């Protein structure tokens, strides 16, 4: 996609390479030009759509849900970009949007599951359907996802922000709206909980394979 465009400032025409601009400059252009000109918005989408999808995928575990929520989150950026005031980085603001959409979807999934279980008293998640043929990277990914799913929601969020999104502890503090020291403590507790969950998953899997 071409990201260069001639922008008129008063009476002067300036050629702008949008792909080289910072997030903050792109946001400024969006606030000035949307909905008439989508160039700056499209650059922001291309810059973050991969990370947004990966985060949604880790939160939700379903590709269909992740694609839908990622699309909804980026559309919300289009709708709400004029409300961005620069008190945090654009990335932090975006991840707050993603976090809220993922939480809402998870709540809907849980409610739906509870309704189903009220009619199917024997309904349980079948975790034995996965066949482990070899200890390859896909197997390790399954272990990681299962361990993540065993964490408390707040612990899972922090682990995903740190390792999937590459956020700093300061950015995590801003997204979760807690102090920097509290974010650091919560991160280390979450990391310890993840390590314990991962060890249990791998031990249980190995024990099952040896039967």
Please place each PLM-identified region on the residue numbering.
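N-terminal module of bacterial RNA polymerase sigma factors
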Residues: 1-50, 58, 211
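Structural recognition of an alpha-helix C-terminal capping motif at a helix-to-coil junction
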Residues: 54, 68-75, 88-100
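Sigma70-family region 2
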Residues: 61, 72-89, 109
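DNA-recognition helix of helix-turn-helix
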Residues: 155, 164, 169-170, 174-201
């Amino acid at each position: 996609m071409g990201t260069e465009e001639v922008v008129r400032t008063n009476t002067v025409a300036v050629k702008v390479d949008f792909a080289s601009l910072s997030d903050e400059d792109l946001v400024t252009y969006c606030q000035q030009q949307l909905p008439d000109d989508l160039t700056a918005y499209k650059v922001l989408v291309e810059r973050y759509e991969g990370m947004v999808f990966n985060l949604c995928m880790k939160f939700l575990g379903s590709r269909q849900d992740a694609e839908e929520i990622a699309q909804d989150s980026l559309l919300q950026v289009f709708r709400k970009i004029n409300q961005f005031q620069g008190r945090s980085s654009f990335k932090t603001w975006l991840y707050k949007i993603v976090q809220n959409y993922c939480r809402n979807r998870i709540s809907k999934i849980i409610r739906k599951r509870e309704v189903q279980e009220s009619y199917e008293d024997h309904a349980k998640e079948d975790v034995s359907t996965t066949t482990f043929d070899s200890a390859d990277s896909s197997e390790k990914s399954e272990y990681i996802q299962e361990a993540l799913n065993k964490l408390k929601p707040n612990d899972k969020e922090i682990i995903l922000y740190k390792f999937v999104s590459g956020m700093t502890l300061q950015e995590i503090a801003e997204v979760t709206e807690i102090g920097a020291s509290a974010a650091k403590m919560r991160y280390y507790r979450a990391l310890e909980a993840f390590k314990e969950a991962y060890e249990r998953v791998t031990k249980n899997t190995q024990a099952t394979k040896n039967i």
